[in-house]
């Protein structure tokens, strides 16, 4: 049994007229445009004169800088009025709320931000990375899976098609001679096929414990939760496949940035400061965010601490980490949005199987997206103000603003 897994039900979100299950299904199929047709246009979201910072977030460690900035009062110290961050119980309602203007700052999966801007015409701008690394592929502890090659014929869950999880997983499967497919769960699979399905993060540990799936790839703390409460075992950490990869990014709508550039700069200043604090105080931050601390996350401190700190020093990961020389952590915190990573994400998405309309992907130019998706000005000013950001282990040596992407199984 998966003890405590029920504490992580993210499906229910109060206060909206659209079925959250329907929204999730539509999002997974790429149908955001039709969903938003009855909502306020995203471009109009900036027209309100209310400058209150309204944060929406999922209860995952990817949201750490937004939550630490709130908990430590960094937003207020920038002169901002801020509402208490609102925990949203799934990607679908978070995306919908952001596009409709309910939230003006959120964390999004980097590929989701790309999909929103170019596939659904929501004017998203990435203003900073929220973290690096921070995810893993876990499998049944007694399932006999020792390598990616052993996943042939298995059922794996990903949190969203437009996610780093889906990109990294499918890369690893292809490199292992396997073919990722998207079929009904009970469909026959070829000898080298691995079936993928969308599953909400809180559903993953109980589904694994009940042997409804053979593994899942997701953000923390659901890997740590699986290890501690669902007899799961980490097969690989995503940061050990794509060195210091982005995952969630801090996002603001472009019309709001253009209307209130000083406001947006203050937001990014506070977030950069929070990432520095999180990088230098991981154990304290884990306790702070947990339900045993300030309660931003429903997970207990034991789970969040493992999710943030347990990595190379753990004997159980001796054969899990293949690139110890990379020197990264289980999750790290640095805000600079490396252009090389955006370029590689676009390139990898073109080779990644995704359910729904993906025609826009075939037309995307990686160099154009690298320049257009990200606002580099705000974050660069914030980094100049808080230069300690470069001390995080995931910042490139030499020129901290440039790096070469490393993707290796």
Label each region the model flagged:
Residues 258-361:
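Secondary-structure end/capping motifs
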């Amino acid at each position: 049994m998966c003890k405590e897994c029920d504490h992580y039900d993210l499906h229910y979100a109060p206060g909206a007229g659209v079925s959250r299950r329907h929204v999730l299904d539509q999002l997974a199929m790429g149908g955001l445009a039709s969903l938003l047709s009855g909502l306020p246009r995203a471009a109009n979201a900036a027209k309100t004169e209310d400058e209150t910072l309204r944060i929406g977030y999922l209860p995952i460690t990817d949201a750490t800088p937004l939550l630490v900035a709130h908990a430590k009062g960094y937003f207020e110290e920038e002169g901002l009025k801020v509402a208490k961050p609102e925990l949203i119980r799934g990607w679908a309602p978070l995306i919908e709320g952001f596009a409709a203007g309910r939230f003006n700052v959120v964390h999004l999966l980097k590929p989701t931000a790309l999909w929103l801007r170019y596939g659904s015409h929501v004017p998203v701008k990435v203003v900073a990375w929220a973290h690096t690394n921070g995810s893993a592929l876990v499998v049944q502890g007694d399932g006999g899976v020792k390598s990616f090659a052993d996943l042939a014929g298995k059922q794996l869950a990903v949190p969203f098609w437009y996610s780093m999880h889906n990109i990294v997983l499918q890369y690893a499967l292809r490199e292992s001679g396997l073919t990722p497919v998207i079929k009904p769960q009970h469909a026959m699979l070829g000898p080298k096929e691995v079936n993928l399905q969308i599953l909400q993060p809180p559903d993953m540990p109980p589904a694994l414990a009940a042997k409804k799936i053979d593994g899942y790839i997701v953000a923390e703390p659901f890997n740590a939760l699986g290890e501690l409460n669902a007899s799961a075992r980490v097969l690989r950490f995503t940061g050990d496949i794509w060195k210091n990869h982005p995952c969630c990014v801090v996002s603001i709508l472009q019309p709001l940035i253009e209307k209130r550039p000083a406001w947006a700069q203050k937001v990014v200043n506070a977030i950069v400061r929070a990432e520095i604090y999180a990088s230098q105080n991981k154990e304290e931050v884990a306790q702070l965010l947990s339900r045993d601390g300030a309660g931003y996350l429903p997970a207990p401190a034991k789970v969040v601490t493992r999710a943030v700190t347990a990595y190379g020093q753990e004997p159980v990961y001796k054969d899990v980490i293949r690139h110890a020389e990379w020197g990264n952590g289980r999750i790290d915190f640095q805000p600079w949005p490396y252009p090389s990573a955006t370029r590689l994400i676009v390139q990898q998405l073109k080779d990644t199987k995704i359910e729904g309309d993906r025609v826009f992907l075939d037309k995307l130019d990686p160099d154009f997206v690298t320049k257009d998706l990200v606002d580099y000005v705000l974050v660069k000013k914030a980094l100049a103000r808080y230069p300690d950001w470069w001390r995080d282990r995931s910042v490139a040596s030499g020129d901290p603003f440039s790096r070469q992407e490393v993707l290796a199984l």
